[in-house]
């Protein structure tokens, strides 16, 4: 069932996710009850993830902060870029390469504010990086958050209320490059 679930949902079968399973229950006088999982419904888990994203976006909208970052004026040519990413991320390397070899010959200053881009500490790590940038806000034109593609569960750290609220209200435009083009996180929805 695990491979079926992971292939169907694009996320790892780990603790903390909600699942809907079909089971049989048996009773043995000596050993007691036993439960056998017969099937799993991956659409239930996908629905729960989508519901959580909708609830966060609705809460941000009710608080009046959902579109605040989008309303900030974007510099015509943002040249001082604070990057939140992992130093070893391929996406970060690709981003820097594209800036360095741009067809216009423009110079861009980038500074990396390292953060974890996967796992249970994504929210805390990215928020800490944003705090560091905020302490030096006058040195930058924009913030870019970069995390390459992966399984849907790998991107769940970007679907949190605290991180979305912080980015929505950040005083600089926040640009996201999270996951593949088809991926959509709460953070993408609030970013510039």
Which residues fall in each region the model found?
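Short nucleic-acid-contacting surface segments enriched for D/E, G, S/T with interspersed K/R
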Residues: 2-21
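Short flexible coil/turn linkers enriched for glycine and charged/polar residues
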Residues: 15-17, 29-31, 75-77, 89, ...
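OB-fold/S1-family single-stranded nucleic acid-binding modules
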Residues: 20-55
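Short, charged beta->alpha transition segments
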Residues: 20-24, 65-71, 98-99
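Acidic/polar active-site rim loop that often engages polyanionic ligands
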Residues: 32-42, 75-79, 186-192
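Short N-terminal or domain-adjacent regulatory/targeting segments
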Residues: 43-75
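Short glycine/threonine-rich loop/turn motifs
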Residues: 82-192
